[in-house]
Amino acid sequence: MEKKPISRQGFDALLRELKDLKENQRPEILKVVQWARSLGDLSENADYSAAKEKQRQIDKRIQFIESVIENAQVIDVDSLSGNRVVFGAKVLTEDEDGNKMECRILSDIESDGRMVISCTSPVGRALIGHCVGDTCTVRLPSGQKELEIIDVKFKD
């Protein structure tokens, strides 16, 4: 499987979440499942059903995080420099109406859709590879938009 970029900070956050899920949340929900099972008839046991559903959600999240970690290409954003937009760059752009937008380009899992955008989003894909002073075209569902790259930085 192709390695997917993720920042060191994002990777470390996933490791912390995985540790919490495995060492705290999953053992706790297993205790609740065991307790609910001890109440008897499982067919009409709402506590048991709810606990099993929560256990499934936790197990699914653990599998997802383990898959992301296994296929991650960790990038130390703080070690990057230059004026070209690459994964990890914080980019200041201006559209044709004079509206400015600053965002950081990171992985899908790290994006929030506003200040941190995915490198696979339409805006992320359009910006990557361009330099300060370049204008690029972003294809959005609402139409095309021209963005001029005003600044690129990597450290806050």
What spans do the regions from the language model cover?
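N-terminal cationic and glycine-rich segments that engage phosphates or anionic surfaces
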Residues: 1-60
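Glycine-rich, flexible loop/turn motifs
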Residues: 2, 38, 70-71, 81, ...
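A generic alpha-helix structural signal
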Residues: 15-18, 66, 127
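Conserved NTP-handling cores and scaffolds of large molecular machines
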Residues: 18, 22-25, 69-73, 131, ...
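Non-DNA-binding regulatory cores of transcription-related proteins
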Residues: 75-155
